[in-house]
Amino acid sequence: VFKNFVESASNGRVGVEIFMGTQLCGNGAECLEGVAEGSIDVYITTSGGAAGIMPFVQVLDLPYLMADDRVAEAVLTGDFTRKMRNMGLEATDGALRLMTIGNTGGWRNFANTRRRVQSPSDMEGLKIRTVVADLPQELVRALGASPTPIPWPELFTSFQTGVVEGSKNGITDIMGMKFPDAGLQYVTLDGHAYMGALWFMNNNNFLGMPDDLRRVVVDGFSQLQQATFASPKRKSIEAYAAFVEGGGDLYVPSPAEKAMFAAAAGPVQDWFTGNVDGGEEILSALKDAVSAAEADLATAYAADLN
């Protein structure tokens, strides 16, 4: 999407070459370093992938702050992303420019091999796979489960052997990795975190372009963002259907049950603001953006439903 738009809208003045996997860099940290140095122009990562350089981006992983896609998309297309961009530029001495935040795979939900999870008490004692980052481990502990960092490639076998009994992933990842074949049969659609995709560009390379080409690039990232908003929705519908057809148990919490999860996870916000530089500032910006988005949607619903 980005390549086609930018190359056509610039009449070929801007070319886009796409390098997959480790063609340009060995891991996420190395890739971001390459962008900061200017040897790589653009790189996509997750909040966890960027947290080593700018820990405050983990605000996107804080649970139960955005209710649904409409809220999330309104937030991420507005001033909140600009706020995060400015904080990122400051944290990297003007090197890394956040161009947009899209979506990588829908929403994170809790899934496990043992039982249906309807309330936080059902999480008690479950061994939940997390990444090594602190924030997701704090969330799992807050809900009464045991965080167990396991490398992604080892997760299938870890489900089979019982080393872990659950995870916090999107349904497309669950089905793509065939985790139900390893015993993952219970998914609770709590939607605790939006799976953000963060696109960074070398700031000097961007600012060194003429105004008209900068506009083309900005518009290209807007087109890319919209495409990433749409694709996971379609893929998720197909993945949910396949999960249920395969015998999986798919549970949708009631509003009251979801409120119980949010209340139990409340201490994670306290941990974030107390332990992450810029945490209080970026969390306040996110909450303000969510409140504004919810108010706009409430007005729209009032008009559309009556």
At which residue positions do the language-model features occur?
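N-terminal secretory/targeting leader peptides
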Residues: 1-71, 89-306
